[in-house]
Amino acid sequence: MKKNYNPKDIEEHLYNFWEKNGFFKPNNNLNKPAFCIMMPPPNITGNLHMGHAFQQTIMDILIRYNRMQGKNTLWQVGTDHAGIATQILIERQIFSEERKTKKDYSRNDFIKKIWKWKKKSNFSVKKQMKRLGNSVDWDREKFTLDPDISNSVKEAFIILYKNNLIYQKKRLVHWDSKLETVISDLEVEHRLIKSKKWFIRYPIIKNIKNINIEYLLVATTRPETLLGDTALAINPKDDKYNHLIGQSVICPIVNRIIPIIADHYADMNKDTGCVKITPGHDFNDYEVGQRHKLPMINIFTFNGKIKSNFSIYDYQGSKSNFYDSSIPTEFQNLDILSARKKIIYEIEKLGLLEKIEECNFFTPYSERSGVIIQPMLTNQWYLKTSHLSQSAIDVVREKKIKFIPNQYKSMYLSWMNNIEDWCISRQLWWGHQIPVWYDDKKNIYVGHSEKKIREEYNISDDMILNQDNDVLDTWFSSGLWTFSTLGWPEKTEFLKIFHSTDVLVSGFDIIFFWIARMIMLTMYLVKDSYGNPQIPFKDVYITGLIRDEEGKKMSKSKGNVIDPIDMIDGISLNELIEKRTSNLLQPHLSQKIRYHTIKQFPNGISATGTDALRFTFSALASNTRDIQWDMNRLKGYRNFCNKLWNASRFVLKNTKDHDYFNFSVNDNMLLINKWILIKFNNTVKSYRNSLDSYRFDIAANILYDFIWNVFCDWYLEFVKSVIKSGSYQDIYFTKNVLIHVLELLLRLSHPIMPFITEAIWQRVKIIKHIKDRTIMLQSFPEYNDQLFDKSTLSNINWIKKIIIFIRNTRSKMNISSTKLLSLFLKNINSEKKKVIQENKFILKNIASLEKISILSKQDDEPCLSLKEIIDGVDILVPVLKAIDKEIELKRLNKEIEKIKSKMLISEKKMSNQDFLSYAPKNIIDKEIKKLKSLNEIYLTLSQQLESLHDAFCKKNKIFN
């Protein structure tokens, strides 16, 4: 092994070794227990970010852990076409490079550009995954637009359609006028903005005599939608207005006569108590319109301008001539804000604008394009999720699918109990084109292809069929991911072996987008051999969101994004600044980002290697919703990897010529060897329990504690003493245990730190005569419930306490570690005497002792000894001969004066009534603790000084 640990020397070489030899591949052995994880397919829109790296590390830990338990493992890898996100990206790209828009290309030519991007992006993402150590079967890599996946998507659509679960309907949707597509409710961001509220008069048509008011006053924040009003609503309990129910008003500008209706949606205590109803452009109004069977008017074009003619529909969405469809010429083709100004101008001219008020209200914005969302009446395809939800609710309630942490179960159930039908169509070019064809009479035909439809329905070639232009929502194909990747609808061996999968690792932000829909679609479409619905996965492990060191969300615009590969390989400051400030959507932020980057990383980012990054992810994987990234912990775990490397070098150096033999734990072995085997066994138990319960943070801490604090800090120090002073038999057997424990420890650590453990294991296996080719196919250490001895643990713990006491004595009395001391023990029982006798040479070596003596109860204690009672035994370390009395007296007096000075300041503060009355409680508590600590130090120093003054011993005292 090289002297210095350099991840670059081992990582790429080892990954190629694993991949080339097919160690990641599953097999078709039905008799072997299977374990399968479906990787949530990252989008092809760019490189992997911290969230991807974090979740993929967790998944790889689980895959490697289960593979080492002898399971037939499949980690299915793939990427998502990400319809809307990818199309936006390519549209921006061609505008930036060519000053062209999507509409300057044919659909096929535009899609060719995306496929070209996909090839480049996929290569980059794949390279990143390999750098992270992902043990995926690359031969089974999938893309959501692969032909076999597309076939699965079509088959799913056809089955759902033929079972009346997919339907087409004109309904109100969230419309993105920039992208000209419907977007999901979950892609709408509500922002609080400053705006105005306009109070508009609607003249009343007086059909009866007892109407004594001229108009109804309505408050609106969207006066442009007045063009689409089809009613005014008042609350039936409102005494001011209920006599007007059934009457009519004139809608200003368009002079449309609309009814006054009674509906509880109108809030008597809000604004005027009367509301305008625009079913074609407001979701609440749409519901009111459905209750009262009101006509619906569409006033906007798909790109957000006023139409040339109104589109008028009845409440069921059928074309209607209920109202005049003409729009005044001066409003036609105006954008929304211009139309708003024009409407207000005209209403004011008509004397129908009563007042304007400033207000703040929430406005829906598209998370995709950033424009204000317009509720729009459009014809879309829907999936009846309300018909699929109950079984998906039941499996979670019955714990057939478990959410970890459990709090996300409530979130899931809450949403599922209020689920609405899912709009599955999108007005995009990139994606799965809906497998629906229309003839010239608008008859609908659903099938895999035009050819198959003609065959199935006996349609001649003379009849023209046109395929629906829309594509399916990306989440529809993603919802089939657990089984489409395994060959469904064909009954493949892989589907039989690996479905249902074992665990889904995902974020809380896509529980509704993806997880819920996967459960519903899988349970409806996939059945076991008995015809029972299959679940997509047994467990759902929800990770927290990785935030920066200040707790802020990582984003390009904030300039706080860190590429995981930059932490693995390192990056210079200039390269990091360039990376963070290039291609910003808001270039004016570049100076701020530059300043922040220089402040945070004045020397760039140092290379840490993959294992340190993976260990950091594991250590931070708590059950919290937000996870704050910590560069200092990353550096600390880089040092941890270095510690393991150096410890392994020591072991290999001292065992290179050792002839290893198998052994069992017995009472004849040295206490330290029995102790390390028991400690390791206990570590295995708690470590496995942590991984089995998805507590990766606890598992990482357990591993860290054993490697650093138990194996390196104590066991290796014990071993050095044995090698230096032990008998031939003790040395030989200790080397055997040493290499054995290291090999087991490497196996235990492998799932979290695959590269460094493989690199070291390849050398360890030679000494242990292991013929296998890789650590990743070794058996994972198992807990042995027979291997436990409380006395061994307590005896070594006692020895450790003695050593720590001696080291503290040296520190207190300023005694060099090269100066030999003596150790006296008093009030010691026979068991402890035996422990001392058998481990005397270890104690002497580690604690730098000249001699160890046992005193009887009658013996006087050595003068000027530091004493501590440890586990009932008096431990005494004489220091008279080890110190220079005059120098030590001077040092102690100086220290005492310093402490007295600090105590005086603290006491003065604590006697100040103003401080006690006005200082915050935490500051006062801190001062109390400080004074207590100073008193304790003063007492200790005073006792040491007194002991020094009493340095001349009485006649019967034992001298050092």
UniProtKB/Swiss-Prot annotation:
Disulfide bonds: none annotated. Residues 879-950 form a coiled coil. It is an enzyme of class 6 (ligase). One of its GO terms (molecular function) is aminoacyl-tRNA deacylase activity. The keyword Protein biosynthesis applies. Its EC number is 6.1.1.9. Monomer. Catalyzes the attachment of valine to tRNA(Val). As ValRS can inadvertently accommodate and process structurally similar amino acids such as threonine, to avoid such errors, it has a 'posttransfer' editing activity that hydrolyzes mischarged Thr-tRNA(Val) in a tRNA-dependent manner. ValRS has two distinct active sites: one for aminoacylation and one for editing. The misactivated threonine is translocated from the active site to the editing site. The C-terminal coiled-coil domain is crucial for aminoacylation activity. This is Valine--tRNA ligase. It comes from Buchnera aphidicola subsp. Schizaphis graminum (strain Sg). The lineage of its organism: Bacteria, Pseudomonadati, Pseudomonadota, Gammaproteobacteria, Enterobacterales.
